Amino acid sequence: AVQASARATSERLQVTNNDHWLACLPLAHVGGLSVITRSLITGTTLTVIDGFDADVVSASEATLVSLVTTALQRIDPSLFRAIVLGGARPPADRPPHCIATYGLTETGSGVVYNGKPLNSVEIEIRDGEVHVRGPMLLRCYRDGTSPLTSDGWLPTGDLGFLRDDGSLHVEGRRGDVINTGGEKVWPDDVERQLIQHPDIHDVAVTGLPDNEWGQIVAAFVVSARPNLSLDEIRAHCRAQLPGYALPKQLELVEAIPRTALGKVRRSELTV
C-alpha cells in the first residue's frame, strides 16, 4: 500500500531523478511521512528539516515540497516546481503548480489531486458520502479491524459530489455540516467569505445548539480589533451567502484550535 501510494503520487507529479523532496511536515502524520516514502521508493534526493521554518524552506533548493495552507502564505511558491497542499482547504487563487490534495491517513496520503483521482484510484459517491478504492488503502487498523467494505471500498466520512467532468468536490466532514432552521450550511463556505475581511486574521465556523433554530452559525474569529461586531461580519458576507448561512454569533478568540496539519478542531469550538 505504501509503495502504491508513493508510485501513484510520483507519477502524477512527473517526478524525475533531478527532483529533490523537502520534508517539513510532522513525520507522525501521513502528510509528512509520505514524503519520506516517495523519496525512498523513487530514489530522489531528500532533505528533512525539524518543523516548518520559512527561511530554511526557502533556502533548501528542493523542487518538491508538501505544505499546509498557512505555510504556503509564508514562502515564495515560485521556488518550487510543485507544491502539494494538504490539511485545511487551500485558497482558490493559489498558483497553478500548487496542488490541492484530498486523502486520509487510511489512503496513505492524497489520492485526489486538484479534484482528479490518481491512477488506480476509484471514487464513488454513495448517499452523498465519498468512497475510495485503490491499492494504497490500508489493510486494517492495529487492532485488526478494517474500515473497508466487503468489496474493498473505504467510506471516508466526507460528503461530496462528482462534477460533470468527473472531478471530486468535497464539501466537508459529515459531522461538520450545520443544520439551521431546516437549511444546511457548510463551515468552509462561510469561512472563505469571512477570511477576506481585512480585520480577520483567522476564522473557524461551527454550529452551536439553539432552541429556535436547532443550530446557529457561529464564527470564532481572531482579530486585532476588539470592537469587531457581528453586524459588521454579517454585512461583509451578505452579498455572497444566503441569509440562513450568515453568522448569528461572533466569538473573538486569541487563536483557532488546529491540528498539526492546519485542520480546525471543531469539537473545541465552544462557548
List each model region and its residues.
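AMP-binding/adenylate-forming
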Residues: A1-R74, I99
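Gly/Ser/Thr-rich phosphate-binding loop
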Residues: T63-L67, A71-P117, E122-E124
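Short beta-strand-to-turn element immediately C-terminal to the catalytic PLP-Schiff-base lysine
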Residues: V111-G115, R126, R133, R163, ...
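Conserved ATP/PPi-binding loop(s) of AMP-dependent carboxylate-activating enzymes
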Residues: P117, R126-D151, S167, R173, ...
